[in-house]
């Protein structure tokens, strides 16, 4: 087991401890009285092993079957279970066996037990799919003589067993409707009504591929302060030039400000994409497709992108031990003032940027005048040129600008766009309605390198998948003279 701390994108974290037969999750944020996720739970996690001869003790005594991992037909399938040590391609199984339910005075009782269980499953899988990847190659008779690089690859899956908490009536059906679990048996079945012994829901699974395409806002969210002004930043727009999350303060927040005069906005940004004041998920599915025309080209009406300063993607990266986040830049040319320390209802102590933090326009001016960047982008020159550049991108109807941050420190500038309306769409022809593209530059030398590129590039693509499930392709368009 590689990871003993599970850091969620909403800022909460759990200590993961091996216990007999499985793994225990314990919250590190016990001071959160209104937390939706319970402070702890235990999952039974084990690995099935195929064997030609089933072990003599593979079938436990009748009186112990309630505690064992024995299921009907296990002996016939000639499988035995072993202790989980490292993930396998598709032989791991789990179920929730125990939930810590503290007094309602300490934690808010669940309004929907099913959704609470779904949250625990999501957190458990979030930890599991951060464990070392198993060998994906399939060992088949047809490919027995094939070199390893040519062998077919399978899907990394973990199976959910109908044991423990999952024996609840209609629970698996609800989880399947949420899109969290799946089954390849998509028939109605011959049983007129389902029973506890029914096998129709006994072979549910979650694949890594599907898990990372589920928007985490469906299952993980945090509560905002009762007074929204406590989250307003001391910026000209009362829109956060977010101090993107660090390891100590993963959720960005701001200090009080006085919303007076013409600067008071209609939009009050929240504390990141996971904040909720209604005790409900912050995710909504994409709207129905409507069409419009741009320069004679018919394309879907696009949803509005995130607001200036809004953090729209957060994730802890174990391999570098840092939080990666993406936010929309702010046009204001004034440096971000010091905001001291603050607190939110979703995390503990909040660390904010120092007085010397440059504005986004200052960063863009610095990066665009780097000879390496200027040669590719051609946007070097006085600050007025970068201001016009940023203004044009903030008013674009088919793209929006992005600032990437490592532990709160900006490192690069990006643009996420819809290919069909972009000039690239006209050049390649046949672009799909929901194809997206990315422009990119890394401005800080300390964050260059192939390892970090692979991380933030896959994260940008990940966001594109989450933003609209209809997106099937994400494109890059390097210059013809780009040697890399």
UniProtKB/Swiss-Prot annotation:
Keywords: Acyltransferase, Cytoplasm, Transferase
Residues holding substrate: 439
Compartments it resides in: Cytoplasm, Cytosol
One GO MF term attached to the UniProt entry: N-acyltransferase activity
Pathway membership, UniProt: Siderophore biosynthesis
EC number in record: 2.3.1.-
Domain of life (superkingdom): Eukaryota
Induction annotation: Expression is not affected by iron availability and is not regulated by the iron regulator sreA.
InterPro entries: Acyl_CoA_acyltransferase (IPR016181), Acyltransferase_MbtK/IucB-like (IPR019432)
GO-annotated biological processes: siderophore biosynthetic process
UniProt keyword annotation of Transmembrane present: no
Active site: 477 (proton acceptor)
Disordered: annotated span: 51-81, 240-264, 335-355
A GO cellular component entry from the record: cytosol
Result of knocking out the encoding gene: Decreases ferricrocin (FC) biosynthesis during iron starvation and completely blocks FC biosynthesis during iron-replete growth. Blocks conidial accumulation of FC-derived hydroxyferricrocin (HFC) under iron-replete conditions, which delays germination and decreases the size of conidia and their resistance to oxidative stress.
Function in brief: Acyltransferase; part of the siderophore biosynthetic pathway. Aspergillus fumigatus produces 4 types of siderophores, low-molecular-mass iron chelators, including excreted fusarinine C (FsC) and triacetylfusarinine C (TAFC) for iron uptake and intacellular ferricrocin (FC) for hyphal and hydroxyferricrocin (HFC) for conidial iron distribution and storage. TAFC consists of 3 N(2)-acetyl-N(5)-anhydromevalonyl-N(5)-hydroxyornithine residues cyclically linked by ester bonds; FC is a cyclic hexapeptide with the structure Gly-Ser-Gly-(N(5)-acetyl-N(5)-hydroxyornithine)x3.
Protein name per its UniProtKB record: Acyltransferase sidL
Organism for this UniProt entry: Aspergillus fumigatus (strain ATCC MYA-4609 / CBS 101355 / FGSC A1100 / Af293) (Neosartorya fumigata)
